[in-house]
């Protein structure tokens, strides 16, 4: 295996060396053309000298001279990736931003998370034209999600057709923007064209011939009076399932056995035949590939956007933006075998409707609306910007092609409405900025100040009765009336800042912010960032800041009840009697300290190198408590959730705790309760390198790029177990699996190297991503997935008359989700399926994907 990695590392080293060589050649040549490479190595125009508006309240910072690491990704960069949406395109463009490639549980397979610097998406703030975009109404954690208690902005809902460019700040910025900006900020800048536009059609499919995706995108700019514009954008994407299976082994039975009289009999553990029975005749025609849970989700997305501006006299401008998205998505769930329906759930009537079992499908219908209107201008020497923003996200969930094993069939439903989640956010904001000439400084002292008011509302609505009664809908139990909730909160903030060039080479920027939230109190944050130009080509930059992540309303009021043959599970609202009885305390904001130190080198206009080291300390990370309760289905052997036999005293302790909340566990039943809580402190350290170069040759322009991210997260402290639980065994605020989810979400390192070529009307791009090893845990057993290389190719041509065409293939060598090694598989998996796939892998199950695109620009 090590030998196989040598060529890969060598090839990346060659790309780096060539890029450095190209930069050195331009530095040596006095006649080098004043061109710079794009941030992602595609054929788009240079972005290194573009003025950026993210991460500072000053107005003259660029990617090159920024005091913090920032990336600018153009619309052309995004399109050249050939990805379905903004989230996937950003993942291709930024090694510091990653996404789990494998299948994720329940709604998380449809509302995808991501990691910036190996941390939860809840720590990344998303802006549109500098205004806060809301997080999803969905909260992760209770149904197998990877980020307990966190909600995040769904980047896939932002229409790519409306985007002019993206600015990604890789640093803490809570002192500028408030909650969530711990690991960074993604600022989506919309198109502001008053004329012209474009229409594109893209289609592709996996190398297996499925997973077909078709996207139609359009933009048009219209004038609004003499000095205004209205930019309209829209897109429609339809993605079909790429079917991937978990194949049952030949010896694994799917149907109940039959006795000598032909009556069905429940199978023994691992679906073995009981004594005196024979296999069901239906086994002869069973489908061993019926379980297609590894298939990619399907969805239909329609997204619209408008960005407008109009002058109000000489000194002011009105501006407005709005986006609307509507997505219906479906994710295939685990197949329900007829043997399981009959034996485990004891629901033979379901076989009247599903005699061969069934494959449930989880469906979400999601609507996202955002809108901002404001006025900005210059009055009395001040630049003033006042705005109002409204955001809303609604997720309605359905279980299709399913059953409730507690109901009688035929007659009971097979499709269920599971309930809705709704999150609304209203923001009023006022920003002021002014430059003051101070003789001691090399540039004006830019002073900024502002105030913000925010109102939030969260609702969880119950589903239909059949979706949650008894066992509930198979695959996703609906929200019950007891789980339903409505909650609101308000917050207000004031902030100040000052920035200047102390000398011609030394830039200094300071900011402070105070916020007060109606539910958990006040938080103060600060930030100091600086840059020193050692020479005209070499600079040093550093930042120190603190930040916070406010516990979402969805996390504070989360409650979900589930039932299965193993018992009833309750994720209790943290302020409920059940949670309080088990030691829950109010959720506190997660607080962070950020430190970064970096250098930049620009020996010529055609070369840029940046190296940044960072440390992020987070205190009070959110997590989920242990499940407290016991299984009394065998009264002679009372066990906890781990299977440990409890003493009479331990059982009595649990009974007493739950009894204070009016909960009792009857003989023959099982019950377990948990809740969200602040579990502990983490430290994330990493190193980021970006190299960009541009080279003129006789046979065209070459654009080189290389980026790498190395990161590591460690657990610094685990909070104490509540006193009321300390006499119980196996109570942990941070289990081993939870620790792995926190520490090893991403590979140990990621490298991305790209080469773009342009000659006349022809363009081509190749980029390779080298994912380092990643630690994994399955069935309590540690293992490691080895490094892997993914290659992407694309080419395009200008056809004349505004027409262009492109072809590409992503994942050329068809790398797919890898297997869990045999020694880490559970006995149940070994006895039932041929292969256990690593659903936490960076690789997806889809494999190679080709696409073609036609674009018309007018």
Please report, for each region that a protein language model flagged, where it lies by residue:
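N-terminal periplasmic accessory domains that precede
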Residues: 86-89, 93, 114-115, 127, ...
